[in-house]
């Protein structure tokens, strides 16, 4: 490990995240070469996630690269497990319903949670829980257009206390393309996980598919989990996992977190919940730089819903007079998409 020495900020027995005192400095450390924010993670918490034997065959893991639809999928799965009844999602914070595997407050430290457990992770496949690969537990991996990911992550970095200041849009874009952001390279992350696609306990789905056909996507997820729903329950899942419903739900919109963790004065956690917002932020030069790296990194990899001729070209129109306009300049409420 190199970089600043992480400090444990709480004991593993503390569970009420919304009432904790957080002291973040925006510093990162590296674990097996990948950057992680100090305070939220530690070498010990990452090693626990990687090496624990606490995996059950009916566990459900929701895995994403940051800002790719994690919370949306958590909401959907929670509703599916309750046959569309929204009582659970309205009474327990989302981070307790689907705790993180790799944080210092680790899901694996809570041994008495009833089955089936939902757990969340941003870990790349090479650091993921080894015991999963010899189990019948299931992973739902959500992918998203990396152009939208970088915009959402830029805004999130402005309000999240544990993350480095993103700097200028150009600086942040370059860091993203080099993998010098939390959890490392988006390209390596998705290429690693999609190798699992032929496994029956792995489902790959995209943010764009959820947006284009939420009902059909929920049916796919139900089939994967072996939990078919009737029409009424299915409609309830769709209605209560919609962006507007999540944004209005205090148990799902992260408004309960302290300002030291999320500075709500600077913006909302659930910002827009749309696809294609990158076109409102990238200059032509930034889009061309992104596309060049994308083509190089993803050569020979399967095509995704965002791999269209439209997405592979620069946004319409001419760049703004400023060579690198701040994305925050056109949004009065900067925050982070789901």
UniProtKB/Swiss-Prot annotation:
One GO biological process this protein is involved in is:
cholesterol metabolic process
Which organism encodes this protein?
A: Mus musculus
- Catalytic activities: an alcohol + 3'-phosphoadenylyl sulfate = an alkyl sulfate + adenosine 3',5'-bisphosphate + H(+); pregnenolone + 3'-phosphoadenylyl sulfate = pregnenolone sulfate + adenosine 3',5'-bisphosphate + H(+); 3beta-hydroxyandrost-5-en-17-one + 3'-phosphoadenylyl sulfate = dehydroepiandrosterone 3-sulfate + adenosine 3',5'-bisphosphate + H(+); cholesterol + 3'-phosphoadenylyl sulfate = cholesterol sulfate + adenosine 3',5'-bisphosphate + H(+)
Q: Give the start-end ranges of region Disordered.
A: 301-338
Tell me the protein's name.
Sulfotransferase 2B1
* Species lineage: Eukaryota, Metazoa, Chordata, Craniata, Vertebrata
**What's a Gene Ontology MF term here?**
sulfotransferase activity
The alphabetized UniProt keywords are: Cytoplasm, Endoplasmic reticulum, Lipid metabolism, Microsome, Nucleus, Steroid metabolism, Transferase
GO CC terms in record: cytosol; endoplasmic reticulum; nucleus
Query: Which residues make up the binding site for 3'-phosphoadenylyl sulfate?
Result: 67-72, 144, 152, 207, 241-246, 271-273
């Amino acid at each position: 490990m190199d970089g600043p020495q992480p400090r444990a900020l709480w004991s593993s027995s503390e569970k009420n995240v919304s009432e904790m005192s957080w002291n973040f400095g925006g510093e990162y450390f590296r674990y097996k070469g990948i950057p992680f924010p100090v305070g939220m993670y530690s070498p010990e918490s990452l090693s626990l996630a990687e090496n624990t034997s606490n995996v059950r065959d009916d566990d459900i893991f929701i895995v994403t690269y940051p800002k790719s639809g994690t919370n949306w999928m958590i909401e959907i799965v929670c509703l599916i497990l309750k046959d569309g009844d929204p009582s659970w999602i309205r009474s327990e914070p989302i981070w307790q319903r689907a705790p993180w595997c790799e944080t210092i407050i680790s899901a694996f430290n809570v041994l008495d949670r009833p089955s089936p457990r939902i757990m969340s992770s941003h870990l790349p496949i090479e650091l993921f829980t080894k015991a999963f690969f010899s189990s019948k537990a299931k992973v739902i991996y959500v992918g998203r257009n990396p152009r939208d990911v970088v915009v959402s992550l830029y805004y999130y970095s402005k309000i999240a206390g544990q993350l480095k200041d993103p700097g200028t849009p150009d600086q942040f874009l370059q860091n993203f393309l080099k993998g010098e952001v939390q959890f490392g390279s988006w390209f390596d992350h998705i290429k690693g996980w999609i190798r699992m696609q032929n496994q029956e306990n792995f489902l790959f789905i995209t943010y764009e598919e959820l947006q284009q056909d939420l009902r059909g996507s929920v049916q796919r997820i139900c089939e994967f989990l072996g939990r078919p729903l009737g029409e009424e329950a299915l409609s309830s899942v769709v209605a209560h996992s919609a962006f507007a419903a999540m944004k209005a739900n205090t148990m799902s919109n992260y408004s309960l977190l302290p300002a030291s963790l999320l500075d709500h004065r600077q913006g909302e956690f659930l910002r827009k919940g749309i696809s294609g917002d990158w076109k409102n932020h990238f200059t032509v030069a930034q889009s061309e730089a992104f596309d060049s790296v994308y083509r190089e990194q993803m050569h020979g990899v399967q095509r995704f819903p965002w791999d269209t001729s439209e997405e592979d070209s620069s946004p319409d129109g001419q760049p703004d007079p400023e060579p690198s306009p701040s994305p925050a300049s056109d949004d009065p409420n900067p925050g982070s998409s789901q």
